Amino acid sequence: MKKLLLLVSCMIMLYSCEDKPTLQKYYVKNTESPKFIALDLASSIIKTDKISLTETEKAALESFDKMNILAFRTDSTDITGYDKEIKEVKAILKDESYQQLMKAGSGNDGAAIYFVGNDDEHIEEFVVLAGKKENGFAVVRVLGNDMNPTHIM
């Protein structure tokens, strides 16, 4: 009986360790690549003591934790690199946890905004994907707690 319980526990642990691609894994994997530019910004970069803010603006800033930016630079000698990388990011964003908020542009040129959260007023993460085949693309992750898009706009 103890062996069966141990076996079931191990199976549950292995099953819960999903190995599906995520934006976080993609970001970590490509941070050191020479084809990418990576930047992390903390909420402390915004000095609120020198500006006057409304209560709504204060609430928006308090819900913001950090921002991760990952940009892919298109190389004229390697056009297929753009197609491969943008396809990988778009595949990650097709996961059901990412909900599209809006989209602009057409084809490979344009931008889209996604969010992760229980509903559209309690958002944990915003993701902006913008790109142009000739220049490259950028993925911007804005992480926070209970972010509300009406406070940001």
At which residue positions do the language-model features occur?
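Sec-dependent N-terminal signal peptides
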Residues: 6-8
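Extracytoplasmic electrostatic interaction patches
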Residues: 105-153
